[in-house]
């Protein structure tokens, strides 16, 4: 069984998300730009397998993954927003399958401008799953989500 601990350091992330509405920016950031940022940060993006590429593959229109050390960041774009919501629910469940519904809610944040974010530390690994519009981000790291949060802010998925 996985041990689940809320990620307290993500309060800064919540601030970033919460203040995003003021920017007026509602479009989903470009996954190609996302890949460029990953490469600039030292992530390998060539021949990196997708952790969740199997889910609703027929509606997956674009996917980009990066790996560096034990950290992974993956960006999935789907044909429609409804599919993204369903995939988000499935991945957040697979990330912490033993979490009771009420406890799961404590790890989830509704994002200003639409979408949701799920964060958890399980078995010493930090996980983040978020969706906004037609795009889903899955990330994990054995160290922290600090660099991943920086990447997400720089690419527009987390808003300053």
What residue ranges belong to the model's regions?
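Soluble non-cytosolic domains of exported or imported proteins
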Residues: 28-29, 81-82, 142-146
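Second-shell loop/turn segments in exported
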Residues: 24, 71-78, 135-142
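Gram-positive cell-envelope targeting signals
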Residues: 1-28
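Short, solvent-exposed recognition patches
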Residues: 32-117
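A short, solvent-exposed beta-edge/loop patch
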Residues: 104-160
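Short S/T/G/P-rich N-terminal loop/turn motif that feeds into the first structured element of a domain
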Residues: 12-17, 37, 132-133
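Generic low-polarity alpha-helical segments
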Residues: 10-13, 73, 137, 155
């Amino acid at each position: 069984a996985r041990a689940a601990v809320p990620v307290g350091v993500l309060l800064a992330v919540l601030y970033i998300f919460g203040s995003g509405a003021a920017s007026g920016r509602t479009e989903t950031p470009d996954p190609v730009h996302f890949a460029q940022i990953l490469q600039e940060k030292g992530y390998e993006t060539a021949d990196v397998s997708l952790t969740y590429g199997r889910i609703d593959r027929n509606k997956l229109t674009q996917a980009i993954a990066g790996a560096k050390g034990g950290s992974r960041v993956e960006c999935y774009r789907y044909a429609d927003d409804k599919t993204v919501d369903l995939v988000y629910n499935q991945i957040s469940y697979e990330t912490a399958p033993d979490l009771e519904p009420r406890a799961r809610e404590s790890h989830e944040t509704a994002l200003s401008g639409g979408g949701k974010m799920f964060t958890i530390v399980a078995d010493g690994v930090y996980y983040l799953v978020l969706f906004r519009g037609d795009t889903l981000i899955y990330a994990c790291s054995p160290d922290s989500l600090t660099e991943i949060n920086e990447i997400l802010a720089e690419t527009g998925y987390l808003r300053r």
